Amino acid sequence: MDTRVAVISIIVENPDATTPLNALLHEYSKWVIGRMGIPYREKNISIICIAVDAPQDVINTLTGGIGKLDGVSTKAAYSKK
């Protein structure tokens, strides 16, 4: 199974979304290379970056699931390799 390296950028504007977001990320933890979270207190949002190495369909499914959460925005950027 071919994999791709990607960075999934997430902006959380609804603090109630953090529990379902963490549960979703836990489901895909075997694909996660690393994670960085930045609380931006002045704007009351959280910025999260997830580095993954996974098949394209797994990345798309994860990103789609994250985007369905209320108050959460996400985008993925892929490596060309």
Where are these regions (language model features)?
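Long, contiguous binding/interaction regions
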Residues: 1-81
